[in-house]
C-alpha cells in the first residue's frame, strides 16, 4: 500500500522540482546502470528510482531561508543558528558565545590549557554555557 502511494506521488516522466535536478541526473545514470542488469525490468527500475527520489525529499530537511538541504534534523537546527544569530553556548570565563557546543569546548582550551578536557568537565561546561546563554 505504501509502495503504491509513493510511486503514485511522482512519476519519473514528470518534471522534477528545481532542487532535485542534479539528484535526478545522478539517478538517471543509476537507472541506466540498472537497465544493464537483466533481472530487473525497466518499469521496476522507474519505480525504484521514483521511490529513491521521494525518499530523498521526505528524509531531508530544507531550510526556509537559504534552501540548503541537510540529512539530519540536528544539522538543520545547527545550520539555522547561522541565520538567526542564536548562540546557545556562552563561555562563563570571557563571555564569548558559540553556535555549536563542540566549538565552545574547543574554546575552553584557551582558559584551561588542557588539550583534551575530560568527559565530566565537558558535560559541566556545556551545562554552564547553556544556562548562561538562556539567562542572558
UniProtKB/Swiss-Prot annotation:
Q: Where in the cell is it found?
A: Nucleus
**Does DNA-binding count among this protein's keywords?**
yes
Return the SMART domains for the record: ZnF_C2H2
Q: Which domain of life is it from?
A: Eukaryota
CC terms in the record's Gene Ontology section = nucleus
Q: Which Gene3D superfamilies does the UniProt record give?
A: Classic Zinc Finger (3.30.160.60)
Q: GO molecular-function annotation terms?
A: DNA binding; DNA-binding transcription factor activity; zinc ion binding
Query: Which UniProt key words apply to this protein?
Result: DNA-binding, Metal-binding, Nucleus, Repeat, Transcription, Transcription regulation, Zinc, Zinc-finger
Looking at the Swiss-Prot or TrEMBL record, what is one Pfam family this protein matches? zf-C2H2
Can the keyword GTP-binding be found in this entry's annotation? no
The protein's predominant localisation is: nucleus
> Zinc finger regions typed C2H2-type: which residues?
64-83, 89-111
Q: Which family does it belong to?
A: Belongs to the krueppel C2H2-type zinc-finger protein family.
**Role of this protein:** May be involved in transcriptional regulation.
Q: What is this protein called?
A: Putative zinc finger protein 818
Q: Which organism is it from?
A: Homo sapiens (Human)
Identify the gene encoding this protein: ZNF818P
